[in-house]
Amino acid sequence: MKILLICFSFLLFFNCISSHSIEIEKLNGYWEIDHINQRKERFEPKGNSPLYDHYFLEYPNGILNKVEIRLDRIIYSSKDIANFKIERLDKKYYIRFKSRWSEWSKQIKHLDSHKLVLEHNKRTFHYKRPDLYEFINDERGK
């Protein structure tokens, strides 16, 4: 009986951990692609001026657009946006995107204040919070 109680406690503990891996309110803001996994390969972004995904969320609806910080340290935003809706099915969260060109969906595998992991078409996209504020404030401090 004692072993059964211990096993049940472990299951409950690990279930609580996994359910807290998605903090949906943390989606708001800027996200920088860290790497992409596909078929056991890891791909990392290359280039001097990375693109960032900017999410604006008023649950359950939101807007996604791409932004870029150029060498002049100004943030440039794409005029193209994708509207989205957060949907929860069977304890899993999905982002349902809709642009003027197409519709697609990504599953949220992990989301907290520092890390976002999305899955789409057998690819896993790993994002991190960029240090944009330090970059912008560095110019003002000079």
Model region roles, listed by residue range:
Residues 17-32:
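N-terminal helix-cap/turn-to-beta initiation motif at the start of protein domains
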Residues 80, 117-142:
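Edge beta-strand at a domain terminus
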Residues 26-27, 53-63, 88-92, 109-115, ...:
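Short, solvent-exposed coil/turn segments at beta-strand boundaries
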Residues 94-99, 118-119:
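Short beta-strand segments that buttress and anchor functional surface loops
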Residues 38-43:
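Short, solvent-exposed loop/turn elements at domain surfaces
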Residues 44-90:
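N-terminal glycine/threonine-rich, aromatic-flanked beta-hairpin/loop signature
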